[in-house]
Amino acid sequence: MSAESGISTFRDAGGLWDKYPVEQVATPEGYAANPQLVTDFYNERRKQLLDVKPNRGHELVAELEKHFHVTVITQNVDNLHERAGSTEVIHLHGELTKVTSSFQPNNPKYIKELQPEEFEVKIGDKAGDGSQLRPFIVWFGESVPMIETAIDFCEKADIFLIIGTSLNVYPAAGLLNYVPAHVPVYLIDPKQVPIASGRKVHVIQKGASEGMEELTRLLVK
């Protein structure tokens, strides 16, 4: 979804992810071994947010709120959906603009939203419990605290839309299994994405912005 805004995805060649092995910057073990490296990596990712803006795809998702009750469930950690105007966003993998306690990362009491002038987190910056501030990111090997909330929304969905995902990162990729069988499912992606057999899916093989233009015409008549 955010690739069209200039944010490199985890699997795309190029960008920040090519500089470091995932094990070094996106696991609890990597953080324990070298907190400075991980802190610098996420500082750099936050700075990238200042240079990008929501694309037309983000804006069209937000505009659907004029016609539907829209809940966005995203694996992206940027804030582009919110900046585009979406009002109900579930971040499965955390949020780049927030930091939290190293000891109790999911304790709401210690989760802090950073203003742009605070994006440069330093070793020595403390959470309310005295621990080092760490990125509010769900790293590989950690549980996904918002997954049950996401499942609940999927079970109640009237329309289900999938945009720009390879459907191979779990548990998010399994959310489609919770969508009732009668609910129409739309998939927007320029590449071919494997879908579980037996599920009828309306595929729009385009990028996020172009695909959302087409979907909006289909849904809003």
What are these regions (language model features)?
Residues 1-221:
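Conserved catalytic core of sirtuin-type NAD+-dependent deacylases
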